[in-house]
Amino acid sequence: MQHVFIVGSKGIPGAYGGYETFVDKLTQYHQDHTQLRYHVACKDTTVGEEIYHNARCFHIKVPNIGPAQAIYYDIAALADCCRYIENNKIEKPIVYILACRIGPFMAHYVRKIHKLGGLVFVNPDGHEWLRAKWPAPVRKYWKISEQLMTKHADLMVCDSKNIESYIRENYAAFAPATTYISYGAETRKSALADDDEKLLSWYAERDLTAKGYYLVVGRFVPENNYETMIREFMKSDTERVFAIITNVNDKFLEELEEKLHYKEDPRIKFVGTVYDQELLMKIRENAYGYFHGHEVGGTNPSLLEALGCTELNLLLNVGFNREVAEEAALYWSKEPGDLANLIHKADQMSQEEITVLGEKAKQRIADAYSWQFIAAEYEKLFLEAFQ
């Protein structure tokens, strides 16, 4: 039996960010596996254990200490893993750490886990130190943390080829062992019908209609280029609306209003968040087009979901996005007027042209990003780790 300890997601089941969805899908696809046993750290206000998808979910009590919570949580979870491995005499465990938050403490825990006969794998996420939401000292910490985790890990598991190249080139002095396994996405359609009451009432409350809107779904942070997308949409001549599904940050929203006066354009609609996955999938399917402005990070879950659901995708032209979508999308730059022109072109496209792009997008997901495929890649990685 290969025991795998996963540290760094908020836990399962729960409100899903990228890592949480990944852990949920991995344990779901492997729940009947006879040779893999998962132990998943879960951030909580109490301690305890439960079984979910046949994984042992162990709760780590985290005090409310502001931004340092994430670092405290990972360290406490690693300490718990070490205790459990030792007490239960588990042979050859794998500890898989998601994100690079605990670099200064990494050497200590790697030594400890090696002493217990285990290996430490790290998923480096995507350039956390570049994210504009962090103040300069925090960004500096993330960069140092990434460096130290790369130095001490037995293997860096990168969910994007761009991230893998970056790790190899920037940390060549450490000669890091790396491998590439992407994030995944669903390839099925939503379970909701076009006339489902839940969908129709969501549309009615927000004055939206199927194929009458362009869509974006994502975290409301500057590096996702909301400013460019809203500005360009306001410049465009489209009669469709721009529906923005996000957890609004008032400070950033005020900044955008000050710069763009978007409230004067009735086509710009902030429509709240949607945590019902079937409803969100249906909203994606019914969008005329999807905008993706993410500029920082590896393989983005929201982009994969868009390619799996929406036929017409308009993506910011950066390496990460091209790597994922290839020829299955249209691309825009941050040059003034570029996205506005692309929206005009998109509005003029025939249904046949849109269908061809949609089929390419779904095929791309099925070929390289389905959860079934990703789970099989991880199975191979974990079961062959000690060979």
Regions found by a protein language model. Name each.
Residues 5-7, 203-224, 230-237, 242-243:
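Conserved donor-binding/catalytic core segment of Leloir-type glycosyltransferases
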Residues 42-46, 185, 217, 241-256, ...:
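Glycosyltransferase donor-sugar binding loop
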Residues 71-82, 92-124, 298:
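An aromatic- and histidine-rich active-site surface loop
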Residues 138-156:
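Membrane-proximal helix-turn-helix segments that form the acceptor-binding/catalytic region
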Residues 150-178, 182-190, 199, 225, ...:
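A short, active-site helix/loop in glycosyltransferases that binds the activated sugar's phosphate group
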Residues 282-298, 311:
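Acidic donor-binding loop of glycosyltransferase active sites
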Residues 308-315:
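Short hydrophobic beta-strand element within catalytic cores of glycosyltransferases
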Residues 329-337, 345-351:
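Conserved acidic donor-binding segment of nucleotide-sugar-dependent glycosyltransferases
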